């Protein structure tokens, strides 16, 4: 006897959840009231916080909700699919007695889901290996391992100067109109470990996976991500969760938690290294504010709830490495700063929780530089544990420090030039201006499909630093300077002679 897909799915669900305590379910009708995304229920027996509720509408459609608040026999439920069309008198409500769980499996790689975890790629339902609570399990702080070993993104400004450690959480601060979606897609295409390590479960490329969650994106952006991942072959190792702008706002509250639960399964049960990208966290915070306003809570700064810091931490702190497990979760949340304001509550609170930030700059974008990453306000607090001999290259730390110093001096020289003119500048200031121009055009700027290894980026950095005489590179140790400054100059001289044997003068190449 052949079974339908629906029957197989139900059998699988029953088998996976066997042993769970089954409680009788109680139905309630009518609904007490509707307020925005919330449904208020009266005379409820034993409601539980975070319990999942099924609402059956008069036309037979079923929507899911979650208990947000319990006051005696009254329960306040947030409905994930929105409250439009709910008839107060005819809607039937059923309390399931369970928290919201997501079916997880390795088969989720290469699949696309909506913001509630339902497949939208016309593929079959997921046959679950397990059902996991989307709020995750608390991790013993003592069991956490310090993040180390670098994740390569193929972007020079990130890999060389703001290296991301495996298990780190580092946000991208962007703003509306800036190419953060393109940068996110490029990171997904190019991300991987710098080298296979001895302690991983599997040294092959398949051991590195990506979980991508988009919240409040429009159809054009959604199509861009799906098409980009499919065309470049990165979809095979990626799980996508897409909450569109026309989807219910309330759904955005569970989308990042679904993504992180999937990431935890892949990292801690299949021992993969998972890069989790969440965009746009500003849409998530706005959904949080909407629910808070509907519950008539006392607002905090700019109308956001006072507990937003705590709520954001329940998402960001789910990154890291755990003792006894070879997998890791690295988080790169992306948020758009309203009015380019870095003091806005969303980037402000995010910066307190996370371990650095990557700053997308509008001025660089307006000058046609891609990716427009401003390295001066950017920071990776765990960079020191991810670079150096044995992990990248022994000159990495010194080169990064020197690039920061010379770029800052170049910015000062450009500001001085605007005041006094180029003729009044010293020789050192003119060198700094030359470095500034070539650093932005050749080092920060790169193609959207250009994947630079960390070694190519470091060699490119040396070719720029050789604009200065050796004695002016005061952030690099003499030993490193002796080994790399001369060697790289000789290599570049040889390359230039091959390209143009008759050329004389400055041997610096604009790589």
Swiss-Prot record:
Molecular function GO terms recorded: ATP binding; proton-transporting ATPase activity, rotational mechanism
Location in the cell: Vacuole membrane
Residue spans of biased composition, Acidic residues class: 491-501
Protein's membrane topology: Peripheral membrane protein
GO annotations of cellular component type: vacuolar proton-transporting V-type ATPase, V1 domain
Function recorded in the entry: Non-catalytic subunit of the V1 complex of vacuolar(H+)-ATPase (V-ATPase), a multisubunit enzyme composed of a peripheral complex (V1) that hydrolyzes ATP and a membrane integral complex (V0) that translocates protons. V-ATPase is responsible for acidifying and maintaining the pH of intracellular compartments.
Record-stated family: Belongs to the ATPase alpha/beta chains family.
Protein name in the entry: V-type proton ATPase subunit B
Gene encoding the protein: VMA2
């Amino acid at each position: 006897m052949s079974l339908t897909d629906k029957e197989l799915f139900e059998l699988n669900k029953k088998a996976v959840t066997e042993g769970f305590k089954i409680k009788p379910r109680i139905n309630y009708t009518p609904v007490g009231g509707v307020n925005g995304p919330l449904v208020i229920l009266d005379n409820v027996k034993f409601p539980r916080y975070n319990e999942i509720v099924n609402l059956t509408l008069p036309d037979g459609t079923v929507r899911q909700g979650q208990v947000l608040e319990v006051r005696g026999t009254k329960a306040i439920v947030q409905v994930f699919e929105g409250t439009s069309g709910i008839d107060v008198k005819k809607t039937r409500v059923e309390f399931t007695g369970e928290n919201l769980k997501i079916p997880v499996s390795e088969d989720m790689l290469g699949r696309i889901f909506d913001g509630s975890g339902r497949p939208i790629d016309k593929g079959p339902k997921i046959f679950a290996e397990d059902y996991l609570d989307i709020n995750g399990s608390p991790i013993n702080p003592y069991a956490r391992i310090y993040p180390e070993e670098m994740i390569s993104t193929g972007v020079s400004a990130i890999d060389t100067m703001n290296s991301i450690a495996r298990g780190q959480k580092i946000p991208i601060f962007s703003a509306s109109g800036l190419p953060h979606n393109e940068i996110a897609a490029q990171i997904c295409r190019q991300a991987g470990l710098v080298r296979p390590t001895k302690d991983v479960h599997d040294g092959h490329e398949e051991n590195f996976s990506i979980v991508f969650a988009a919240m409040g994106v429009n159809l054009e952006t959604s199509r861009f991500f799906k098409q980009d991942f499919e065309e470049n072959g990165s979809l095979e190792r990626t799980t996508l969760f897409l909450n569109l702008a026309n989807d219910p706002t309330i759904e955005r509250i569970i989308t990042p938690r679904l993504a992180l639960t999937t990431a935890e399964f892949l990292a801690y049960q299949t021992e993969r290294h998972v890069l989790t990208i969440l965009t746009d966290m500003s849409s998530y915070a706005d959904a949080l504010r909407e629910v808070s306003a509907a519950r008539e809570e006392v607002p905090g700064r700019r109308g956001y709830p006072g507990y937003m810091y705590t709520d954001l931490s329940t998402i960001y702190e789910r990154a890291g490495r755990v003792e006894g497990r070879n997998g890791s979760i690295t988080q790169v949340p992306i948020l758009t700063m309203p009015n380019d304001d870095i003091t806005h509550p969303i980037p402000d609170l995010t910066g307190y929780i996370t371990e650095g930030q990557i700053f997308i700059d509008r001025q660089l974008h307006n000058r046609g530089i891609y990716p427009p990453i401003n390295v001066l306000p950017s920071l990776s607090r765990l960079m020191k544990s991810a670079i150096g001999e044995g992990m990248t290259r022994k000159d990495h730390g010194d080169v990064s420090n020197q690039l920061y110093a010379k770029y800052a001096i170049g910015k000062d020289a450009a500001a001085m030039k605007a005041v006094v003119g180029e003729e009044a500048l010293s020789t050192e200031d003119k060198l700094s201006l030359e470095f500034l121009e070539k650093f932005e055009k050749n080092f920060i700027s790169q193609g959207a499909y250009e994947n630079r290894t960390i070694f190519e980026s470091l060699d490119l950095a040396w070719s720029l630093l050789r604009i200065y005489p050796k004695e002016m590179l005061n952030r690099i140790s003499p030993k490193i300077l002796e080994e790399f400054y001369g060697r790289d100059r000789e290599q570049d001289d040889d390359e230039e002679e091959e390209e143009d044997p008759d050329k004389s003068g400055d041997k610096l190449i604009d790589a």
